[in-house]
Amino acid sequence: MDFGALPPEINSGRMYAGPGSGPLLAAAAAWDALAAELYSAAASYGSTIEGLTVAPWMGPSSITMAAAVAPYVAWISVTAGQAEQAGAQAKIAAGVYETAFAATVPPPVIEANRALLMSLVATNIFGQNTPAIAATEAHYAEMWAQDAAAMYGYAGSSATASQLAPFSEPPQTTNPSATAAQSAVVAQAAGAAASSDITAQLSQLISLLPSTLQSLATTATATSASAGWDTVLQSITTILANLTGPYSIIGLGAIPGGWWLTFGQILGLAQNAPGVAALLGPKAAAGALSPLAPLRGGYIGDITPLGGGATGGIARAIYVGSLSVPQGWAEAAPVMRAVASVLPGTGAAPALAAEAPGALFGEMALSSLAGRALAGTAVRSGAGAARVAGGSVTEDVASTTTIIVIPAD
């Protein structure tokens, strides 16, 4: 740019309108901080590698790693120096600006010169202001030259200060194809291990089969033969598990079938409503109450809560022989007749009143009557036999009586 062709108003206005040297000083500080961090990283890398390769870790691997990381450490050191140089150049550029700014004519001075010239020209009626006008123009030319010189110097110094060494990219310290190669090696090793495992198990099975079959031919080795068969079966199970496991080819082939099963279960949800209704409905009697299941509805209605509470009474029981029973038993029992009323020709005394209750607990009454009847057949010494008459034992002549109780129809 030709700064000499520009008036001082433009050159001075540009210098005073800019942000000044503040951004350059901030950039210099940032470059210095980056340089310090890079120097610290390089020192840390160097000390770590040196500590590993000197004592605890020695051998081909340590030498290879140290050789691989050495270019990176060198790049960090070089980059740190470049960052430091960039910071110094930024400081130089800031100084150059301050020098050019100080050499530039302030815009107010230029404005005052132009205002004075206009005033002298306006009042120069008779030519009396001609020397003053010439002096003012000469002063303005000096300011023009001063600003042009300052701008030329500033441009040259800034060009020198802005010359920086280009930064380089960090060197490649690893093999780009190592990841793919490592994955291929791992897959190959896994496949080889699986195939060798199956081959070894097949070889073991083939070697055990003849000895196991031979041991079965003798009875003396039955126990060892069974143990051999257990080993053979276990080997077969292991082989089948390896061939059909979830990570085998056969197991991977079953993955599409899982989606089919899932859709089948979703479609089967519509058939669950009848099953749920049957599950939530009334349950049939089971266990000891299962014989009573047909009675429900035909003979026995639904169970309903009792209408009232429990009641009790005192001295209201009736007697069946010598047994106290509730009054309801007598109401539900059929009438039983004594053998004397049925067979009047016999000499047996009635063992039970004519209107004695029976039915539900008739067996109890009969057992009591039978016991009393048998008591009547016992022979008593000196006093004769005991005779049962009307439910009581009385003295009678010695005799033997058989009591037969026949319930009423």
UniProtKB/Swiss-Prot annotation:
Q: What is its main location?
A: secreted
GO terms for cellular component = cell surface
Keywords assigned by UniProt? Answer: Cell wall, Secreted, Virulence
Instruction: Give a GO biological-process term.
Output: response to host immune response
Q: Which InterPro entries match?
A: PPE_C (IPR022171), PPE_dom (IPR000030), PPE_sf (IPR038332)
The UniProt record lists the keyword Cell division: no
Pfam entry (one): PPE-SVP
- In which domain of life is the source organism classified? Bacteria
Task: State whether keyword Membrane applies.
Answer: no
**What's the protein here called?**
PPE family protein PPE32
- Source organism (scientific name): Mycobacterium tuberculosis (strain CDC 1551 / Oshkosh)
What broad taxonomic lineage does this protein's source fall under? Bacteria, Bacillati, Actinomycetota, Actinomycetes, Mycobacteriales
